[in-house]
């Protein structure tokens, strides 16, 4: 597995990876895409999210139960970059 920035615990990373895979496997948009490709997408996606999280984001999440607004852009960019890298190639 790729190296992570380390802000998310191993348990959080594992949970995020499982959630990504579950969502990708069940999406009607992904019919015909192999699980191995979707797995690579999810590893890329979770890794990119973790690389872009800051200590401030984690603190905000712990205090508010949600991530700050900028997190939506992190999610969008991570998804787009990993889609282009792993699925659309």
Label every PLM stretch briefly.
Residues 3-5:
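Boundary at the C-terminal end of the N-terminal hydrophobic targeting segment
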